[in-house]
Design a protein with these regions (language model features):
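Rieske [2Fe-2S] iron-sulfur-binding domain
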Residues: 46-153, 161-164
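Short, contiguous pre-domain boundary segments
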Residues: 3-17, 175
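Non-catalytic accessory segments flanking enzyme active sites
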Residues: 19-59
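Generic structural signal for secondary-structure transition and capping sites
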Residues: 34-38, 84, 203
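Short linear motifs in intrinsically disordered
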Residues: 41-47, 129-130, 265-269, 303
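Short, solvent-exposed beta-strand edge segments and adjacent coil->beta transition regions
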Residues: 12, 38, 180-182
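Short Pro/Gly-enriched beta-strand edge/turn motifs at strand-loop
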Residues: 36-41, 120-123, 269-274
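C-terminal catalytic domain of Rieske-type non-heme iron oxygenases
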Residues: 66, 76-77, 139-141, 146-378
Length: 378
């Protein structure tokens, strides 16, 4: 088979340009891929101690993780009386109210600190009869501390089974880590475009001066499974030369913390389809998830975790790493916006084009397209 025919064969799994703008297809994606897929809600480190709560920013704070005596639970954060939001952000339930959930508007009180079902209405001032309106409680499943909502209809993914064969699970261990920050990043392009950029290393050298001098794709290793892929890349030049001032600061902080010794990898990037990404960097773990808002708007939520001692004592390390991460994120935005702008231009003139995959640097993108076509039956 000639190189040209191989390229043409490879390109057959690419998606048509209309797939990034079509409202009907987008609605079907939400139902088929997201509603019945791995429904990530947050990490248990957001509520490490009993009495902690964390409202979900990706859901306009409409639900909350609460650490009760029964464990970490997910409840509605909307009062059953006048539908007001109850809890705000991250914090601790007020011990003055017995550690229960209390709406500040009219003092409706819901159980969260005793054997009664969490979210059960236990107080409604000035009502002669109990309204019997409880907060909804949503069952959870857990993998490596990542919390996923169980699908009430009995469908959806078995996360533990999907990720059972994951090679670098030990590197993605959150033991001894703490959540430092949650970043919400709005992307003006299709969610699939985000995943495509994430799953190809072809652009790292040309488009990421900072990241491209921090990691090297010369020793890129892929791990593929039915519902996930993993990229592992090495350290560039023993971190001897930074490609941007922001990465210079990050590399200096990293080498200072490590007494000048380079790490074993540059990065590990896990993608659990369709939208969960767990990332390893030296002394850093992140969970990045996509929450589609429309065919051309996507919310990216990034949670930054570090060893507890770094969170407590190494603020310069934390700030330098997050600045480097966000520099790369902004560069990825430009790539994705250019791609979708080109697709829109092709669609406007009634044309459809796609190019070949570069192997091995775009193998992940090809697997994602094949996974998408199978799941969506297209």
């Amino acid at each position: 088979m000639s190189d040209l025919s191989l390229q043409l064969q490879q390109a057959s799994s690419q998606l048509p340009v209309s797939a990034y703008f079509d409202e009907a297809l987008y609605a079907r994606e939400l139902q088929t891929l997201f509603a019945e897929g791995p429904r990530y809600v947050g990490h248990r480190l957001a509520v490490p101690e009993a009495g902690n709560f964390h409202t979900l920013p990706q859901e306009q704070h409409g639900r909350a993780l609460v650490h009760t005596p029964k464990g970490v639970e997910l409840i509605s954060n909307v009062c059953r009386h006048r539908q007001a939001l109850i809890l705000q952000g991250r914090g601790e339930l007020d011990t003055g109210t017995g550690g229960n959930v209390v709406c500040p508007l009219h003092r409706w009180t819901y159980a969260a600190a005793d054997p009664r079902p969490t979210g059960m209405l236990i107080g409604a001032p000035h009502f002669e009869q109990d309204p019997c309106l409880n907060l909804h409680n949503y069952p959870l499943t857990e993998w490596n501390g990542l919390l996923f909502e169980k699908n009430a209809a009995g469908r959806g993914r078995d996360v533990a089974a999907d990720l059972a064969s994951l090679g670098p699970r030990a590197d993605l261990d959150f033991s001894g880590y703490a959540l430092d920050r949650v970043e919400l990043h709005e992307c003006n392009y299709n969610w699939k475009t985000f995943i495509e950029v994430y799953l190809e290393d072809y652009h790292v050298g040309p488009f990421h001066p900072g990241l491209g001098s921090f990691v090297t794709c010369d020793d890129l290793r892929w791990e593929f499974n039915r519902h996930f892929s993993v990229q592992t890349v090495g350290v560039a030049n023993r971190l001897g030369r930074a490609g941007s001032p922001v990465y210079q600061r990050w590399q200096e902080q990293l080498l200072k913390y490590r007494d000048g010794k380079p790490p074993k990898y540059g990065a590990i990037w896990l993608t659990y389809y369709p939208h969960v990404m767990v990332e390893w960097y030296p002394h850093v773990l992140t969970v990045s998830t996509l929450h589609p808002i429309g065919p051309q708007k996507t919310l990216n939520m990034v949670e930054f975790f570090y060893p507890e001692e770094i969170v407590a004592f190494e603020r310069e390390f934390v700030e330098a790493q997050q600045a480097a991460y966000m520099e790369t994120c902004v560069e990825d935005d430009e790539i994705a916006e250019r791609m979708d702008a080109g697709r829109r231009a092709l669609m406007a003139r009634g044309e459809d084009e796609s190019g070949p995959y570069q192997s091995p640097m775009e193998d992940g993108m090809q697997q994602f397209h094949e996974w998408y076509r199978k799941e969506m039956s297209v």
